[in-house]
Amino acid sequence: MKAMLCCPGRGRPREFDIEEALASALRVFWSKGYEGASLSDLTEAMGITRPSLYAAFGNKESLFRKALDLYEREKLTYVAEALEAPTAREVAERLLRGAVASHASTSGPRGCLGVISSVACGADAEPIRDEVIKRRASSQEALVARFERAKAEGDLPANIDAHGLTAYLVAIIQGMTVQAGAGASCEALEALVKTSLAMWPSA
């Protein structure tokens, strides 16, 4: 999608592709986090001026929210697909392997944008942190519901706490994404996947 935006006093309007600019902003946020990404970093990567950024995306917070939407569409589709797996163990396996494929890829920044941004500590970043936590909570609620269904179907032991199992799995995934961001190899992350699955409760 093309957007024609005019910077006052700059002559002819400058044409740029909004989706390409947003993808560039996503890479900056993913690499540096919300607080670490300056407006100069963003405009340079996007190839636009600050007035063009404000006109197309609003402020930095609004730009990040749009980038987070793009990140979820492009990098987190495996989450919804995993919930459709026939067994709870397969749900866990698809989530774990999906996290490795998404966050340890050599084709883009490593680590998880949500994890990076949820630990932002400045007051200005509080709305962003709250937004990331809210989105994560929605995904976790869906996972709890899936594990409750697995218990009802006899796929998980009746004494398993679905909330606790979800928290355990999320903690493993978040730990893996942090390690991926720190440069852990796919082989090392795969070993974590295998260990986690070996400990998975069986009915």
Model feature map: region roles:
Residues 2, 110-116, 158-179, 191-199:
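Hydrophobic alpha-helical segments that form the core
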Residues 9, 20, 24, 28-62, ...:
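Helix-turn-helix
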Residues 66, 79-110, 162-169:
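Hydrophobic alpha-helical connector segments
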Residues 69-75:
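Short, basic, alpha-helical segments at the C-terminal edge of helix-turn-helix-like DNA-binding modules
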Residues 76, 126-153, 164, 191-194:
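Amphipathic alpha-helical packing segments from all-alpha helical-bundle domains
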Residues 91-92, 106-129:
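Amphipathic alpha-helical segments used for helix-helix packing
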Residues 102-105, 149, 169-186, 199-203:
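Amphipathic C-terminal alpha-helical segment
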